Design a protein with these regions (language model features):
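Single conserved hydrophobic/aromatic residue that forms the stacking wall/gate
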Residues: 1-7, 11
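Cofactor-binding active-site loop characterized by glycine-rich and histidine/acidic residues
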Residues: 12-128
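Short beta-alpha junction loops
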Residues: 111, 138-141
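Asparagine-centered polar/low-complexity signal
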Residues: 123-124, 137-139
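Short hydrophobic alpha-helical runs that function as membrane-insertion/retention elements
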Residues: 132-135
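Long, well-ordered, tryptophan-enriched scaffold segments
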Residues: 141-154
């Protein structure tokens, strides 16, 4: 019960955070990059694909991942962990090189933050001169050492 209850609470917070992101930012002009596939489900529901989650005969209308072929709100096919920051850095750099505007937001979970690609993305983000926002979804149930997330709270 403890873990399933915690998982349910975590997913509720993920849904609330995704709603807040869509309220504050103007997707798809502002580009939101989620880290792993399950983080994209509320995003998909908010961007016109909710029927695929509500009606069994429409389940096949969406993939289990973000997918640019499904929607302009998806910018990559994402399924692997620790990639959002690096991908968002690429979008931000491309936006800046083209003289465009708009926000780029990377959403990453605390467990994914310990991955090598996430750390490389943080290193590059520190040198990036453009507008890049990193949102850490700290659900506090990550089984990994918490030093990285604890350091980011300072």
């Amino acid at each position: 019960q403890g873990y399933s209850s915690a998982a349910s609470d975590v997913y509720k917070r993920q849904v609330e955070a995704t709603i807040a992101l869509h309220y504050v930012f103007e997707s798809p002009k502002d580009k939101i990059v989620f880290d792993v596939s399950h983080q994209t489900y509320p995003h998909k529901m908010l961007t016109g694909r909710k029927d695929a989650y509500l009606y069994e005969d429409k389940y096949d209308e969406v993939s289990g991942y973000s997918n640019p072929e499904e929607s302009d709100h998806d910018h990559f096919i994402i399924g692997h962990t620790s990639t959002s920051i690096s991908l968002a850095c690429g979008l931000a750099k491309g936006r800046d090189l083209q003289g465009q505007s708009g926000n780029v937001i990377a959403v990453i979970g605390d467990g994914s933050l310990s991955g090598g690609e996430a750390l490389e993305g943080l290193d590059y983000a520190a040198e990036l001169q453009g507008n890049l926002i990193i949102v850490v979804n700290d659900n506090m149930i990550c089984p990994l050492p918490r030093t990285m997330v604890e350091c980011m709270r300072i």
